[in-house]
Amino acid sequence: MAERGSDIRPGQILDHNGSLYLVVKTMHTQPGKGGAYIQAELKNLKTGAKYQERFRSDGYVKRAIVEEVEYQYIFGDGALLTLMNTATYEQVSISADMLGEKGVYLKEGIILTLSFYQGQVVAARVPDYVVLEVVETESVIKGQTASSSYKSAVLENGERISVPPFIKVGERIVVYTVDDTYYERAKD
């Protein structure tokens, strides 16, 4: 399916130069001279190599036709992850490398989205928002307004992110996994 270059978004899978690529990042650029373009960071789904590609905003790119299916994470043994289709209860194993650095958000029961291309799993992603518990946080000095209003916190998965000063140890927070940032307190 052809799509305008200006419509490329992170998370999409493109069929470009005979290979499948995952769009990791995009940036729209309007130079003073010449036409606008999209600077995209692409990841080759076969080799894992990343590279930069420039697409004209008014040009067209071929988007791969993929089927996205939700799978529940059951367990992992290091290199392989075992997942279960939430509709058919069919189990599938995928490489842990498919999630890359987002694998830190895996915990039993989390729902992942798998992308299938011609019957093969080509990509996997965690939800955009996950709920995690704060296990360690810095103390805040009352009245400290001259510096940043965020403090560092360690989550149950070992990740360190910045949180507002009112967050305490033991609280559950929502983390935006796209850029690994605090979103809000969990509404349990």
From Swiss-Prot:
Give the family, as the similarity comment puts it. Answer: Belongs to the elongation factor P family.
Name of the protein in its database record: Elongation factor P
Annotated GO biological processes are: peptide biosynthetic process
> What gene name is given for the protein in this entry?
efp
Does Protein biosynthesis show up as a keyword for this record?
yes
Keywords (alphabetical) are:
Cytoplasm, Elongation factor, Protein biosynthesis
State its role: Involved in peptide bond synthesis. Stimulates efficient translation and peptide-bond synthesis on native or reconstituted 70S ribosomes in vitro. Probably functions indirectly by altering the affinity of the ribosome for aminoacyl-tRNA, thus increasing their reactivity as acceptors for peptidyl transferase.
Q: Which GO terms describe its cellular component?
A: cytoplasm
- List the InterPro entries: Elong-fact-P_C (IPR015365), NA-bd_OB-fold (IPR012340), Rib_uL2_dom2 (IPR014722), Transl_elong_fac_P/YeiP (IPR020599), Transl_elong_KOW-like (IPR013185), Transl_elong_P/YeiP_cen (IPR001059), Transl_elong_P/YeiP_CS (IPR013852), Transl_elongation_fac_P (IPR011768)
UniProt-listed PROSITE patterns: EFP
Q: Which species does the entry assign this protein to?
A: Anaplasma marginale (strain Florida)
Leader sequence residues = none
Q: What is its main location?
A: cytoplasm
In terms of Pfam families, this protein maps to:
EFP, EFP_N, Elong-fact-P_C
Q: Where in the cell is it found?
A: Cytoplasm
Where does this protein act, in terms of pathway?
Protein biosynthesis; polypeptide chain elongation
Q: What terms describe the molecular function in GO for this protein?
A: translation elongation factor activity
